[in-house]
């Protein structure tokens, strides 16, 4: 849960994003990560579950600023950068 919170906060601090992921968006990420883990036959979520669904869940939930649009940057590109910048917790269980 802390990892999802850190990712959501990072979208609000990213200079190319005008409006980042909301608390409700973070809940959607958490729910989808749980569903992804279930489909992988696990009853727990690992960071890779969050990373696997993050772009799909969040791309339509952010609003890019004009600089990003002028630079022809897509939401997925910026969210990929956010994933790289936020430290992932240890997935060992």
Regions flagged by a language model, labelled:
Residues 2, 11-93:
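C-terminal engagement/docking regions of AAA+ P-loop ATPases
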Residues 5:
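Oxyanion-binding "anion nests"
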Residues 8:
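Alpha-helical substrate-binding/gating segment
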């Amino acid at each position: 849960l802390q990892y999802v919170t850190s990712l959501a906060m990072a979208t609000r601090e990213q200079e190319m994003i005008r409006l980042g992921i909301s608390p409700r968006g973070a809940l959607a990420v958490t729910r989808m990560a749980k569903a992804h883990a279930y489909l992988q036959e696990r009853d727990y979520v690992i960071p890779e579950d969050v990373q696997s669904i993050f772009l799909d869940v969040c791309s339509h939930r952010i609003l890019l600023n004009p600089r990003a649009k002028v630079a022809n940057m897509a939401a997925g590109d910026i969210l990929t950068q956010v994933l790289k910048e936020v430290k992932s917790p240890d997935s060992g269980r």
